[in-house]
C-alpha cells in the first residue's frame, strides 16, 4: 500500500515539473547563462553554451578579427607592387657591383676577354669571316711557336714562310676580287708573283708585255693596232 502511495506522489511531481518547465530548442542561440547571476554570466556562458554553436562562434570571432585588417592588407599589397621596380633596380645595382669587384679582382683576364669578344661574336655569325680575321693576329707572332696556333691556322704551323707570304698578298688578293683590271695594272705586284713563273725567261717576257697588257685593259682597240704586238702575233 505504501508503494502505491509513493508512486502516485512521484507521478504528481513529474506532471507539475513538466507544466512549469522552460524548454530551449537544441539549435537555439538563446544563452543559458541568462538564467545565471550577472557576475557568473561572462565566465560560464562559454561553458554552458550549446556545443553545436561553438564552431560557429569561433568562425564569427575569426571573421571579426580579419575583416578590419582587410583594407590594411590591400594597401600593403598595392605598396608592395609599387616598390617592385625599386627592388628590381636594387638587384641590378648589386649585380653590377659584384661584376665590378670581379673585374678588379682579375683585370688581366677581363681585358683579354674584351679583346676577343668581337671575334667570338663574328665566329658565331659568320665562321668564314671569323677564320679569315683569325689569320691576321697570328701572322705577327714569331715563327718559333707554330704548334701553339695549330688549331687556328694549319698553314702557319706547317709552313710559316708561305703563310707570311700569303698574308702579304692578302690586300692584293682582295683588290683582284674587287677590280681585276686595277689588280693587273699594278706594276709593283710583279715581284710578288715570281713563284708563279716557271723560269726566268717567262718572267722577263711578262715584264716586257706588262705595258701592252695595261694598254689592252684601258683601250683594247689601240692595243690591237700596235705593230709590235701584230708582228709578234702574226
From Swiss-Prot:
Organism: Zea mays (Maize)
Role this protein plays: Zeins are major seed storage proteins.
Signal peptide annotation: 1-21
Protein name according to UniProt: Zein-alpha 19B1
Family indicated by similarity: Belongs to the zein family.
A GO molecular function held by the record: nutrient reservoir activity
Superkingdom to which the source organism belongs: Eukaryota
Keywords tagged on the record: Repeat, Seed storage protein, Signal, Storage protein
Pfam families: Zein
Other noteworthy facts: The alpha zeins of 19 kDa and 22 kDa account for 70% of the total zein fraction. They are encoded by a large multigene family.
Amino acid at each position: 500500500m505504501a508503494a502505491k502511495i509513493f508512486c502516485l506522489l512521484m507521478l504528481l511531481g513529474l506532471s507539475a515539473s513538466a507544466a512549469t518547465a522552460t524548454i530551449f530548442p537544441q539549435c537555439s542561440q538563446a544563452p543559458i547563462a541568462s538564467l545565471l547571476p550577472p557576475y557568473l554570466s561572462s565566465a560560464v556562458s562559454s561553458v554552458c553554451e550549446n556545443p553545436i554553436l561553438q564552431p560557429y562562434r569561433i568562425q564569427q570571432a575569426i571573421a571579426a578579427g580579419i575583416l578590419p585588417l582587410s583594407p590594411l592588407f590591400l594597401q600593403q599589397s598595392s605598396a608592395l607592387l609599387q616598390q617592385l621596380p625599386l627592388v628590381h633596380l636594387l638587384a641590378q645595382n648589386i649585380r653590377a657591383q659584384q661584376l665590378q669587384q670581379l673585374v678588379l679582382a682579375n683585370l688581366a683576364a677581363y681585358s683579354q676577354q674584351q679583346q676577343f669578344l668581337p671575334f667570338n661574336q663574328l665566329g658565331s655569325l659568320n665562321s668564314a669571316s671569323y677564320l679569315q680575321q683569325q689569320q691576321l693576329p697570328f701572322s705577327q707572332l714569331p715563327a718559333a711557336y707554330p704548334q701553339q696556333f695549330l688549331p687556328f691556322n694549319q698553314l702557319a704551323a706547317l709552313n710559316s714562310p708561305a703563310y707570311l707570304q700569303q698574308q702579304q698578298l692578302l690586300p692584293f688578293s682582295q683588290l683582284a676580287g674587287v677590280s681585276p683590271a686595277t689588280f693587273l695594272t699594278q706594276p709593283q705586284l710583279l715581284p710578288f708573283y715570281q713563284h708563279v713563273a716557271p723560269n726566268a725567261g717567262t718572267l722577263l717576257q711578262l715584264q716586257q708585255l706588262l705595258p701592252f697588257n695595261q694598254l689592252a685593259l684601258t683601250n683594247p682597240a689601240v692595243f690591237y693596232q700596235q705593230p709590235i704586238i701584230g708582228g709578234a702575233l702574226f
